[in-house]
Amino acid sequence: MGQERLDNANPTLFDSKPRHRPVTGTERDESVEDPIDSWEIFDLIRDINDPEHPYTLEQLNVVQEELIKVFIDEEETFVKVNFTPTIPHCSMATLIGLAIRVKLLRSLHPKVKVSVSITPGSHSTEESINRQLADKERVAAAMENQGLMHAVNECLRVPE
Protein backbone atom coordinates (compact mmCIF):
# COMPACT_ATOMS: atom_id res chain seq x y z
CA MET A 1 0.00 0.00 0.00
CA GLY A 2 1.43 3.38 -0.97
CA GLN A 3 2.06 5.98 1.69
CA GLU A 4 -0.37 8.40 0.02
CA ARG A 5 -3.28 6.03 0.71
CA LEU A 6 -2.71 5.70 4.46
CA ASP A 7 -4.96 7.62 6.83
CA ASN A 8 -2.03 8.12 9.19
CA ALA A 9 1.24 7.73 7.28
CA ASN A 10 3.49 8.28 10.33
CA PRO A 11 1.83 6.94 13.48
CA THR A 12 3.45 7.45 16.86
CA LEU A 13 4.72 4.22 18.43
CA PHE A 14 4.56 3.49 22.15
CA ASP A 15 6.43 1.04 24.37
CA SER A 16 4.70 -2.23 25.16
CA LYS A 17 3.83 -3.15 28.73
CA PRO A 18 5.57 -6.10 30.37
CA ARG A 19 4.02 -9.45 29.43
CA HIS A 20 3.79 -10.69 33.00
CA ARG A 21 2.34 -8.98 36.00
CA PRO A 22 3.28 -9.72 39.59
CA VAL A 23 1.49 -12.82 40.83
CA THR A 24 -0.37 -12.49 44.12
CA GLY A 25 -0.82 -15.23 46.71
CA THR A 26 -4.49 -15.67 45.89
CA GLU A 27 -3.67 -16.15 42.19
CA ARG A 28 -1.44 -19.09 43.13
CA ASP A 29 -4.15 -20.63 45.32
CA GLU A 30 -6.16 -23.01 43.12
CA SER A 31 -9.00 -23.09 45.67
CA VAL A 32 -9.68 -19.36 45.20
CA GLU A 33 -11.70 -18.27 42.18
CA ASP A 34 -9.71 -15.83 40.06
CA PRO A 35 -12.19 -13.55 38.27
CA ILE A 36 -11.27 -12.03 34.94
CA ASP A 37 -9.88 -8.50 35.15
CA SER A 38 -8.84 -5.62 32.90
CA TRP A 39 -5.24 -6.87 32.60
CA GLU A 40 -6.41 -10.23 31.23
CA ILE A 41 -8.70 -8.53 28.71
CA PHE A 42 -5.85 -6.22 27.69
CA ASP A 43 -3.58 -9.22 27.28
CA LEU A 44 -6.13 -10.80 24.90
CA ILE A 45 -6.36 -7.74 22.63
CA ARG A 46 -2.93 -6.09 22.87
CA ASP A 47 -1.47 -8.10 19.96
CA ILE A 48 -4.26 -7.45 17.48
CA ASN A 49 -2.65 -6.16 14.29
CA ASP A 50 -3.50 -2.73 12.99
CA PRO A 51 -5.21 -3.11 9.58
CA GLU A 52 -3.12 -0.31 8.08
CA HIS A 53 0.33 -0.65 9.67
CA PRO A 54 2.66 -3.51 10.66
CA TYR A 55 2.15 -2.70 14.34
CA THR A 56 -0.09 -3.98 17.11
CA LEU A 57 -2.90 -1.99 18.65
CA GLU A 58 -0.83 -1.77 21.83
CA GLN A 59 2.19 -0.33 19.98
CA LEU A 60 -0.07 2.35 18.48
CA ASN A 61 -1.71 3.01 21.88
CA VAL A 62 -5.11 2.21 20.36
CA VAL A 63 -5.81 -0.17 23.26
CA GLN A 64 -4.77 0.57 26.82
CA GLU A 65 -5.41 -1.36 30.01
CA GLU A 66 -6.70 1.83 31.63
CA LEU A 67 -9.55 2.01 29.07
CA ILE A 68 -10.86 -1.46 29.95
CA LYS A 69 -13.43 -2.04 32.68
CA VAL A 70 -14.70 -5.37 34.00
CA PHE A 71 -17.87 -5.49 36.08
CA ILE A 72 -18.70 -8.72 37.91
CA ASP A 73 -21.70 -9.55 40.05
CA GLU A 74 -23.53 -12.76 40.98
CA GLU A 75 -25.53 -12.72 37.75
CA GLU A 76 -23.08 -11.74 35.04
CA THR A 77 -19.70 -10.49 33.91
CA PHE A 78 -19.59 -7.41 31.71
CA VAL A 79 -16.46 -6.26 29.84
CA LYS A 80 -16.28 -2.72 28.44
CA VAL A 81 -13.40 -1.87 26.12
CA ASN A 82 -12.77 1.64 24.84
CA PHE A 83 -10.23 2.05 22.07
CA THR A 84 -8.62 5.20 20.70
CA PRO A 85 -7.93 5.47 16.95
CA THR A 86 -4.60 7.09 16.10
CA ILE A 87 -6.32 9.99 14.30
CA PRO A 88 -9.83 11.52 14.61
CA HIS A 89 -10.82 10.61 11.03
CA CYS A 90 -9.44 7.04 10.97
CA SER A 91 -11.31 5.09 8.29
CA MET A 92 -10.30 1.80 9.93
CA ALA A 93 -11.99 2.48 13.29
CA THR A 94 -14.98 0.22 12.59
CA LEU A 95 -12.73 -2.64 11.47
CA ILE A 96 -10.53 -2.21 14.54
CA GLY A 97 -13.56 -2.24 16.83
CA LEU A 98 -14.94 -5.31 15.08
CA ALA A 99 -11.58 -7.09 15.41
CA ILE A 100 -11.51 -6.37 19.16
CA ARG A 101 -15.10 -7.56 19.55
CA VAL A 102 -14.52 -10.76 17.53
CA LYS A 103 -11.33 -11.55 19.48
CA LEU A 104 -13.20 -11.22 22.77
CA LEU A 105 -16.22 -13.19 21.54
CA ARG A 106 -13.89 -16.01 20.47
CA SER A 107 -11.83 -15.91 23.69
CA LEU A 108 -14.32 -15.36 26.50
CA HIS A 109 -17.10 -17.53 27.88
CA PRO A 110 -20.36 -16.96 25.96
CA LYS A 111 -22.05 -15.66 29.13
CA VAL A 112 -19.62 -12.73 29.35
CA LYS A 113 -21.20 -9.60 27.91
CA VAL A 114 -18.87 -7.46 25.81
CA SER A 115 -19.09 -3.81 24.81
CA VAL A 116 -16.54 -2.24 22.48
CA SER A 117 -16.63 1.47 21.73
CA ILE A 118 -14.45 4.39 20.73
CA THR A 119 -12.99 6.48 23.54
CA PRO A 120 -15.24 9.56 23.87
CA GLY A 121 -13.94 12.54 21.91
CA SER A 122 -11.31 10.61 19.94
CA HIS A 123 -13.06 10.15 16.57
CA SER A 124 -15.14 12.39 14.32
CA THR A 125 -17.88 9.75 13.78
CA GLU A 126 -17.66 7.91 17.11
CA GLU A 127 -21.43 7.89 17.74
CA SER A 128 -22.17 6.19 14.42
CA ILE A 129 -19.38 3.64 14.83
CA ASN A 130 -20.34 2.94 18.45
CA ARG A 131 -23.93 2.25 17.35
CA GLN A 132 -22.67 -0.22 14.73
CA LEU A 133 -20.39 -2.00 17.20
CA ALA A 134 -23.19 -2.23 19.79
CA ASP A 135 -25.73 -3.65 17.31
CA LYS A 136 -25.60 -7.44 17.74
CA GLU A 137 -27.38 -8.05 14.44
CA ARG A 138 -24.93 -5.88 12.51
CA VAL A 139 -21.97 -7.57 14.17
CA ALA A 140 -23.45 -11.01 13.36
CA ALA A 141 -24.01 -9.94 9.74
CA ALA A 142 -20.44 -8.63 9.54
CA MET A 143 -19.16 -11.98 10.84
CA GLU A 144 -20.97 -13.70 7.96
CA ASN A 145 -19.38 -11.40 5.36
CA GLN A 146 -16.40 -13.34 3.98
CA GLY A 147 -14.46 -10.29 2.82
CA LEU A 148 -14.89 -8.47 6.11
CA MET A 149 -14.04 -11.57 8.14
CA HIS A 150 -10.89 -12.04 6.05
CA ALA A 151 -9.85 -8.50 7.07
CA VAL A 152 -10.73 -9.20 10.73
CA ASN A 153 -8.82 -12.49 10.68
CA GLU A 154 -5.78 -10.70 9.24
CA CYS A 155 -5.92 -8.34 12.22
CA LEU A 156 -6.13 -11.34 14.56
CA ARG A 157 -3.40 -13.34 12.81
CA VAL A 158 -0.47 -14.18 15.04
CA PRO A 159 2.87 -13.21 13.43
CA GLU A 160 5.06 -16.15 12.45
Curated annotation (Swiss-Prot):
Superkingdom: Eukaryota
Pfam families per UniProt: FeS_assembly_P
Extent of the signal sequence: none
Matches recorded under InterPro entries: FSCA_dom_sf, MIP18, MIP18-like
An example Gene Ontology biological process: chromosome segregation
Any coiled-coil regions, as ranges: none
GO CC terms of this entry: cytosolic [4Fe-4S] assembly targeting complex
Region Disordered, residue ranges: 1-32
UniProt keyword list: Chromosome partition
Biological function: May play a role in chromosome segregation through establishment of sister chromatid cohesion.
Annotated family: Belongs to the MIP18 family.
Name assigned to this protein: MIP18 family protein F45G2.10
Native source species: Caenorhabditis elegans
